Amino acid sequence: MTSKQAMSSNEQERLLCYNGEVLVFQLSKGNFADKEPTKTPILHVRRMVFDRGTKVFVQKSTGFFTIKEENSHLKIMCCNCVSDFRTGINLPYIVIEKNKKNNVFEYFLLILHSTNKFEMRLSFKLGYEMKDGLRVLNGPLILWRHVKAFFFISSQTGKVVSVSGNFSSIQWAGEIENLGMVLLGLKECCLSEEECTQEPSKSDYAIWNTKFCVYSLESQEVLSDIYIIPPAYSSVVTYVHICATEIIKNQLRISLIALTRKNQLISFQNGTPKNVCQLPFGDPCAVQLMDSGGGNLFFVVSFISNNACAVWKESFQVAAKWEKLSLVLIDDFIGSGTEQVLLLFKDSLNSDCLTSFKITDLGKINYSSEPSDCNEDDLFEDKQENRYLVVPPLETGLKVCFSSFRELRQHLLLKEKIISKSYKALINLVQGKDDNTSSAEEKECLVPLCGEEENSVHILDEKLSDNFQDSEQLVEKIWYRVIDDSLVVGVKTTSSLKLSLNDVTLSLLMDQAHDSRFRLLKCQNRVIKLSTNPFPAPYLMPCEIGLEAKRVTLTPDSKKEESFVCEHPSKKECVQIITAVTSLSPLLTFSKFCCTVLLQIMERESGNCPKDRYVVCGRVFLSLEDLSTGKYLLTFPKKKPIEHMEDLFALLAAFHKSCFQITSPGYALNSMKVWLLEHMKCEIIKEFPEVYFCERPGSFYGTLFTWKQRTPFEGILIIYSRNQTVMFQCLHNLIRILPINCFLKNLKSGSENFLIDNMAFTLEKELVTLSSLSSAIAKHESNFMQRCEVSKGKSSVVAAALSDRRENIHPYRKELQREKKKMLQTNLKVSGALYREITLKVAEVQLKSDFAAQKLSNL
């Protein structure tokens, strides 16, 4: 960014751009509000934004900073934007020099925050004046040159440090990813003895005695001195701007552009010149990159003669030039999302407002305060020629992009059509309707999936229809509630379902009347089991879906007889609810909507693949009118907290669940029920005595608890709260009444009993699988023994027939013994398919048991 100083008799002025705003810094001996100037120096700042309606810059806000130095001469050195190491945010800064009579120079670096408040980030004193080579880098870090040495000071250390590298000049300084703060400049290098024996010319000595190097300020060592700029350019390069860097085989490769004394803009890539542009003016001094959108990148070059030009990066041709400028800024001034260049002309800094300027992106965006008085030649005479060279490739690229876009659109439309038809066919199949959605032409285009034969489709339909069951057999009731921003749908199943439940999924398919597509809503499932027993032993099973511990009894013929741990005696009645919780906010975009509730049950039968069963539970209808009237909204009346049992299950499904193991080595935990009933004002739910409903006013109201005291000194406490804040409040209240040296442990995977049962189940499954291996071997051994007995019987018949000829018995007996010995030495083999099936089952079961053991060990 190029900024020039405009100075009057009693003030100094600098401008820069930040987030689309123009910041005007003024250092004066007075206040804007005071008519008479004072002796106290004041630094003022004005934020100005461009108004697209009036096409002028208007003042947005102001700020000031008082400098308590009356007898000193103050001067603005520079201003720009750098990153603060504390936050990593780019903020505007300004450097001020203070000179006293004793030739002591003090420097201040002030950072401007969004509230127009200044913060002094760095201050230091020097015995000399910084005249050239002043740069401010991220940190902030100030770098300058004095005599033939370079120095820097950082806001992190606050100490002046000299650069150890013997640089004759520094062309670029900045931060490179993974390398930190680096310098790029010319460094003097020593010639070899052979080169010193020769007598090179002055020009050759100037060229080959210096080399461009990349120097790290952190490690204070040279990172690279190759693949930068060839030595032949060392005497003519005046300015460098690094575009990109990468490390290839531990070697730094750099892509950069450079300005030369020959009035050229040269592009270098890995030390090789790629493009050259002859600039229209002399003495170039700075380069800025402008992205005007649509892949149009420009290099905006500023000149000492108050001129500027724009060079197109793609063709490396001059696109525009301007004369008689005072400042060139690049930012998104009009808020279009792309960058523009702001050209301030010479007379624009003489008043409080910007009077003479132009904003352009070298395309459609053009704003000018005085278009007739600018005296600028925006484009060269060969502008049309350059345009004709560029437009045809762009048109070809656009045609290719449009063709690809059309193909992609057709592909997406076909996918959407197939998915829509599949959803509709699935819903019709679930509801028992005839599926007439597919035409004969569409059916001909369909191909079987996974390499199946065509005749297998009918078999699949028969199996699928068998898997769909009537909801009256398994589902007793369906209900739904609205809690805060969640929709809770619950399904009460019959007692027979829980005895064979391995894995369930409750899905919601949204059906819109005006659209044939069905949308699967994202849901969070939970299985809740509550006991209706009046005695205090809790039977709330905090189990995950599909994880029920069961006891497997091994029999000699390797058949499994299963009895589930969660199966209680007939006196212990248990209510089972399967819930699905989904976000309500996306559904509010519809005035009313309908969802089909589908229950999927996956069962694993012995020795077979998992079998899926589908149950259509019903439909959920909800509208904005129902929500506004509070028809399904869950509330807590003061006199009757739980009006319906569905409300209780909705709370258990939607609330945040936390499980804690409480252990008291020295004292019995008799105070837990006192805490629940007296301190927390809990009421026991009559239908489910294990659940406590908190009626304490405030944020505690509505919180649910379950307490299972396993021993007098240990128990499991489960808290269902609206959020974690309420949960922490409950724990804070609980700690006050617990005995001394009491321990609380968060059980992230649920209660310990559940994990123990799950561990037992997985170990027993592993034993069953291993027994199948031994049973296969036993089966082959049994067949072998039967063959031996048959062979023995045949030999006895032969011996009886030849009893009258005893002289021939001995050879046959020897032959029989030889055959037995031969068969006993034969290796017993199991078929390869059976062996692979058994080993796969063993690996799966062992993996599950190891996972369960790991969870249990982490408690």
From Swiss-Prot:
Signal peptide: none
GO biological process, one term: positive regulation of double-strand break repair via homologous recombination
Post-translational modification N-acetylthreonine, affected residues: T2
Keyword DNA repair applies: yes
GO cellular component, one term: chromatin
Keyword Transcription: no
Broad class of the protein's primary localization: nucleus
Compartments reported by the entry: Nucleus
Record's keyword terms, sorted: Acetylation, DNA damage, DNA repair, Fanconi anemia, Nucleus
Role summary: DNA repair protein required for FANCD2 ubiquitination.
The protein's assembly and partners: Belongs to the multisubunit FA complex composed of FANCA, FANCB, FANCC, FANCE, FANCF, FANCG, FANCL/PHF9 and FANCM. The complex is not found in FA patients.
Disease with which this protein is associated in UniProt: Fanconi anemia complementation group B: A disorder affecting all bone marrow elements and resulting in anemia, leukopenia and thrombopenia. It is associated with cardiac, renal and limb malformations, dermal pigmentary changes, and a predisposition to the development of malignancies. At the cellular level it is associated with hypersensitivity to DNA-damaging agents, chromosomal instability (increased chromosome breakage) and defective DNA repair. Some severe FANCB cases manifest features of VACTERL syndrome with hydrocephalus.
Protein name: Fanconi anemia group B protein
